[in-house]
UniProtKB/Swiss-Prot annotation:
It comes from Metallosphaera sedula (strain ATCC 51363 / DSM 5348 / JCM 9185 / NBRC 15509 / TH2). Pathway: Amino-acid biosynthesis; L-histidine biosynthesis; L-histidine from 5-phospho-alpha-D-ribose 1-diphosphate: step 1/9. The gene is hisG. Belongs to the ATP phosphoribosyltransferase family. Long subfamily. SUPFAM superfamilies: GlnB-like, Periplasmic binding protein-like II. This is ATP phosphoribosyltransferase.
Amino acid sequence: MKIAIPNKGRLQGPALQFLNSVGIKPMANDDRALMVPTSWEGVQLVTIRTEDIPNIVETGAVDLGITGLDYVMESGADVEELVKLDFGKSRLVLAVPMSWNIEDPRDMPKNVRIATKYHNIARAYLERKGIEARLVKISGAAEIMPSLGAADAIIDVTSTGTTLKLHGLKPIDVVSESYAMVIGNKNWMKSEEADRINLVLTMMKGALSARGKKMIFMNVDDVNLEAVVSSLPAMLAPAVSKLSNSNAWEVVTVTDEEMLPEVIAKAKTAGARDIVVVNIEKVIK
């Protein structure tokens, strides 16, 4: 099976890190390679322009793709969102020069020139808002266009707004929200690779479910068992098993990382000892 990933840009690094957490690691170090074998037998990575991934997935040429919601919306590709990822969060915004004393997009001059590479999204947004504008099609950085005089405003992706500010621009409206996702062809379940695809998706969801969670092991004397167990959070309930040749028990539970100090403090107060904390790679539901 083939998984399409961005060949560059803001999603490439996080996509590779995510696949690594799943256990899918590229087995070639040559950046020029466009199709790369992985640590999973029968699974290949294909590096494609992020904006092309939705259409390539739609054709069935690749089985899965990692891209952004903004690119899926812009392409109009008939694909299925299979896994929502926890990276690539951004906003598509309408930004104007800071010198413009406006906050409402409807206050822009008629036939304002807006530079964007998201023509379909921008057109739908402008129609929805009833704004008369002329779209300037670009494929590179939009932020520089007003400074060059090639456009008056832009519609582009921003995460922090720092780049906009650097180029003397300010956002006045959010056109849409975006995030990274795993997409598939609408007919992926009928594919010859359906079983392998399903396993990959299961492992992807498992890796996401494990993010920010810790597993805690502790020993507890018989007399303190009830107090310790009642103090602990768990996904269902703490696991308890008797230690051989001892009046003590091993208790195992899972908690969110931010709750860890509080959980350990309560467990120790209740009588737990020999506490060991380990990372969790995957939680398969």
